Every structure is written in C-alpha cells, then in structure tokens.
C-alpha cells in the first residue's frame, strides 16, 4: 500500500459466510492489532486488509469471537506478508560558514543524509537535507565541533522511509534483546506448545 495511506479494510465476503453484522467486528479485531506491531513492536501503518472468507456458528459466534479470530488471522498473515520497518526522516537546514560547508556536507552524508540543495546567506551557506532522525539525535555538539561553534540547524519531521536492512535488523535484534531482558527481570517465561 502506498506510504501515508493509513489503513484500508476491504470486505470481499460473498454468500454470507460471515454475516454482515459481524463484519465491523472483524475490522475492529484487525484495527486493535495495528498498534502492537509485528516487527519490533512498532505500530503498523499503511496496511490493506482484504477479508474474503470465514465461517459462522449460530450459537458460538459473537462480536468478541470475530474480533479475536480476525486478530489471530491477521497475525498469521503478517508472517507471510514481509512487513518492513519504516524510519522517520527529518528535513534539516544547517547554517554554516562557507569554509565549513564541505565538512558539514560530508558529515550529513556520513549520517545517511541526502543533501537537497544550498542557499547563500550572508558569509555562509544554508544546507538543506533529509536525514534519518536517529542519525541527528545528538547532532548539535557534533555541528558545534565541525563549525567551531559557528553553525546552527533546524529540523522538522518530513516523512517515513523504509529502513535499510542492516538498520532494520539492528532494531529488531535490540528490541528482542530488551524484551528478553524484561522477561528475565519479571521472572516470567513464555513457552510455545505444538
């Protein structure tokens, strides 16, 4: 699904295999699963779910039963869907003296940044770039060092992009390690049975 489209629920049920009054329960079950995430526990975005089959029992079917079944079915489908991790990208404007421009651009590139352009301003330059947010969390002291205290920057959220495989793998590994550590601290242990 294209970036920024949110959530789309498509009802392709024919023949009444799921009664119409339970379709909203199916959608709610899927929607309730989105915030929990699948990869590293981050919320899922830009998801299209198509319901095309199901079953119904006169006595045992209920709103809650359809919500639970939809959530479980959605999680099972996610294993085959190849979800990806998106990382936030910020738009950055860095003001620096002319003589520091090359070092600032080199530093932005080393942070996986994309330089979009430059504008002259007084005795310096304003460099416009897009950089993964994780790469500029502690940017101020580095910029001060590069520019001998004569540089400044502004940033704001721009959009999300697919995280490169090594970054995504690192995020997943760190999240799983943190979950295991939290489980060990609480003394709880999860077991799977077949």
Show where each model-derived region lies.
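Accessory interaction regions appended to the cores of large information-processing enzymes
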Residues: 1-194
């Amino acid at each position: 699904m294209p970036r920024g489209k949110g959530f789309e629920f498509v009802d392709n049920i024919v023949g009444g295999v799921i009664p119409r009054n339970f379709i909203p329960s199916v959608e709610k079950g899927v929607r309730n699963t989105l915030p929990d995430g699948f990869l590293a526990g981050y919320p899922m975005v830009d998801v299209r779910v198509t319901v095309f089959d199901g079953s119904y029992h006169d006595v045992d079917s209920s709103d809650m039963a359809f919500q639970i079944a939809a959530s479980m079915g959605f999680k099972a489908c996610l294993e085959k869907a190849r979800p990806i991790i998106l990382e936030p990208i910020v738009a950055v404007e860095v003001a620096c003296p002319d003589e520091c421009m090359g070092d600032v651009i080199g530093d932005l590139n080393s942070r996986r940044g994309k330089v979009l352009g430059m504008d002259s301003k007084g005795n310096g330059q304003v460099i416009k770039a897009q950089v993964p947010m994780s790469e500029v969390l502690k940017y101020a002291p580095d910029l001060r060092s590069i520019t001998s205290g004569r540089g400044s920057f502004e940033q704001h959220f721009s959009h999300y992009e697919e995280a490169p495989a090594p970054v995504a793998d690192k995020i997943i590994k760190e999240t799983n390690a943190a979950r295991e550590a939290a489980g060990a601290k609480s003394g709880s242990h999860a077991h799977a049975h077949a």
